Amino acid sequence: MLHSRVSKVLVHSLTSALLAVGVLGAQERPGDKGETAEAKKLRGRPAHPKPSEIDSAANLDALLSRKDKGAFSEAKGATIEGYVVQVEREEDGDYHLTLASAAGETDTKKWVIVEVTPAWQKKSAELTGNNLRKLLGKKVRVTGWLYYEPDEDQPDPRGTRWEIHPVTDIKPAS
């Protein structure tokens, strides 16, 4: 009986400790907004989209004009081109790059957000903060996964809730 109680206490303590350090369950990062496990999974995808997974209809203009959640599939990736008009590091470690069809665009309704996660920053030198900041004002081609940002009360301005998140590749565009 005593052995059984001690075992239960030890299992409970070990489980609590593993949850606390993020070994079990979804690990929270600073700035997490309490999103669902599914949202975290989508935003944390570890692989590049395969060519067969790229939605060729999902370009910058299409993301801005087809804004509803059913317009695209989060199971697909996309490659979009645009000028980088903002680069910001968020509290959760993601880098938000704002893309628009014109350099220096100030109309937020013409902006698309693409996000580079800390995991992808570690995977590719092109995706580190220093290199991302160098892209400001330049035209780029961004590849990654389509993601619909559900937080409609979010104060940041944008032209659409559709994002590329995570970004898996950025290259200069001609």
Where are these regions (language model features)?
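OB-fold and OB-like single-stranded nucleic-acid-recognition modules
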Residues: 27-174
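N-terminal secretory signal peptides that target proteins for export/translocation
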Residues: 1-7
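Short, functionally important structural connectors and interaction interfaces within domains
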Residues: 10-11, 162
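Bacterial N-terminal signal peptides
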Residues: 12-22
